[in-house]
Swiss-Prot record:
The keyword RNA-binding is assigned to this record: yes
Tissue specificity remark: Expressed in pancreatic beta cells (at protein level). Expressed in the brain.
Gene: ELAVL4
Protein's organism: Homo sapiens (Human)
Region annotation (Disordered) ranges: 12-48
Gene Ontology terms describing biological process: 3'-UTR-mediated mRNA stabilization; cerebral cortex neuron differentiation; dendrite morphogenesis; learning; locomotory behavior; mRNA processing; positive regulation of 3'-UTR-mediated mRNA stabilization; RNA processing
Domain-related comment: The RRM 3 domain is required for binding to poly(A) RNA, for the association with polysomes and with the EIF4F cap-binding complex and for the stimulation of translation. The RRM 1 and RRM 2 domains may contribute to polysome association and stimulation of translation.
A GO molecular-function annotation: pre-mRNA intronic pyrimidine-rich binding
A GO cellular component entry from the record: dendrite
Domain RRM: start-end pairs: 51-129, 137-217, 302-380
Keyword Repeat: yes
Name of the protein in its database record: ELAV-like protein 4
Amino acid sequence: MEWNGLKMIISTMEPQVSNGPTSNTSNGPSSNNRNCPSPMQTGATTDDSKTNLIVNYLPQNMTQEEFRSLFGSIGEIESCKLVRDKITGQSLGYGFVNYIDPKDAEKAINTLNGLRLQTKTIKVSYARPSSASIRDANLYVSGLPKTMTQKELEQLFSQYGRIITSRILVDQVTGVSRGVGFIRFDKRIEAEEAIKGLNGQKPSGATEPITVKFANNPSQKSSQALLSQLYQSPNRRYPGPLHHQAQRFRLDNLLNMAYGVKRLMSGPVPPSACPPRFSPITIDGMTSLVGMNIPGHTGTGWCIFVYNLSPDSDESVLWQLFGPFGAVNNVKVIRDFNTNKCKGFGFVTMTNYDEAAMAIASLNGYRLGDRVLQVSFKTNKAHKS
């Protein structure tokens, strides 16, 4: 079957409890906490509801081009949008994809829902049409204990209704909670009940009462300004341009979850495949590579050659394999002109050298189905197609 290898990978993935909502949000949460539409409820019948998808829990450093490339591998897209904060320009971690063919939308859900990208497990579901009952259901919570986890925050608020998403703001340098969070309910009336029940109350472990109010209240403009300062503060962990900093954060996250990558594999991975420290070339030293003839290096990133793919393999399989290691620019499976079947190899272009090298170290020799993959940086030698 065409999707056997892909389904095998999805079935071995473990959901991210820390990034996900409570278990009753089966229709898909939204990872944004301001002005974010909720996922569509089951049973919608409009034509748009069959082609329009909402994608949650995207890596914050994923670009519009990477977003389009991922979902474009499924079928023809009419439109797609990665939603960004209007003040900071930062991705809010969710987006929308509208396919031309409803079958492609359904295929995208079946294929990409649960896909592990970097440190995130994305959620793909039908987008729910907006209505008065679901608007303005997002709450701003301050005064939270610094030790409170996202799961504990959800447990505190879940008694008032179905939680779509939750978030606790943390210091970008120390990782310590700022005592501020967001909760988005399925309906506004649930949010109103939570305000009545929790505003001014002391949750377990708190020394002061918490403040609970609607996040989109005009008085919350100051909190948006604070968020803007978080991203623009000169006290950043890494000096230099912001896009370089983002790539270093990607590497930090990658190293932190390196051993967790093994859960995606169908077979054991030796410890040497996921070393605790792996940085042959840092992003800060990339400028020294200009003009050098380095295997795999292209104008858009680092090209990886993947050999011994099965005839039924397609681009989605490559996304599944390489997505957990870092930012993937594009993937390509080389197909036979007559049969349209995979000729046994393909290419993956990744933005960052460290992440590409980690992917090669982990996936070279990996058994996918009944085949052992050969993975390496692409050399200048052209592969016949």
